[in-house]
Amino acid sequence: MGISNFASICSRTPLPLCSVIKSTTHLVLSNSTKIHDFDPQHLNIGILPKCYARSIDIANTTIFGIGNAFINIAALGVILIILYNIRQKYTAIGRSEYLYFFQLTLLLIIFTLIVNCGVSPPGSNSFPYFVAVQIGLAGACCWTLLINGFLGFNLWEDGTTKSMLLVRGFSLCGFMANFLASILTFRTWIENHEIPNTNTTALFVVVYLWNLINLFIFVICQLFVSFFIVRNLWVTGAVLLGVFFFVAGQILTYGFSSQICEGVKHYLDGLFFGSICNIFTLMMVYKTWDITTDDDLEFSVSIDKNGDVLYN
């Protein structure tokens, strides 16, 4: 797979960004026939996947990827529960930082629903911008995790204005880097749909390689904290389980999406199972933080009937 061309990725996986980039490498027809070195100049479409989940019509409204939509709606509920639990741990280390991270993931899931389900349909003028925002939010989450990974080393005081400025500053940098890489890549599509090919080198490096490095550093930091600081193998298990779900999700999404789609007769695709794995990955991120901060409460905290916080 060349990083300057998403043809091999988009032919297997119906990613939203595939609708706003082009490739002269191949075209996959409805009968799965591949045409190499074709001229897509007059086609007002992006790179077509070999197989994708079928859409449904409800009240004259077309909804794409209904199975994946249900998973993402369920993910919203999971994230809301996680946010509630984080808010209940009043004195936990990194409470504000992880609260901010999961708020970002909540926003990311909302934009994922917008681009995956056809709220902003492919081919519309707004679609490239929504896709760029979604990619930008994914980058912001990765950059936020990078900073949160260092909280266990007590390099700075958590929850302070300085700490939150650092976290929000890095998340903003991550958002801008991924958003600009995306929107500049999509610019030729926005200006002229008849372009023959899209150079995606910068998009691949920023969105895939750079964010992967950030996640790798976060995992290494968490493993170091679990082994040498908290010395709790339950933390190690949560980290490794999160890595397992993340890797499994990427493999199912990018490696076996077409096989899954054909096997279940177009009712589901790899994005469905990838989204499930992403939910479990986020749950393990929360659980890792939850276990490492389990003993932070040195006194009991309760809320009276007036909503005031009581410290005992």
From Swiss-Prot:
GO BP terms: cell wall organization; chitin biosynthetic process; endoplasmic reticulum to Golgi vesicle-mediated transport; protein folding; protein transport
Annotated transmembrane regions: 63-83, 99-119, 127-147, 164-184, 201-221, 233-253, 266-286
Name of this protein: Chitin synthase export chaperone
PANTHER family assigned to the protein according to its UniProt record, in alphabetical order: CHITIN SYNTHASE EXPORT CHAPERONE
Membrane is among the record's keywords: yes
InterPro entries reported for this sequence: Chs7 (IPR022057)
Organism: Candida glabrata (strain ATCC 2001 / BCRC 20586 / JCM 3761 / NBRC 0622 / NRRL Y-65 / CBS 138)
One Gene Ontology term, aspect cellular component: endoplasmic reticulum membrane
Membrane-topology annotation of the record: Multi-pass membrane protein
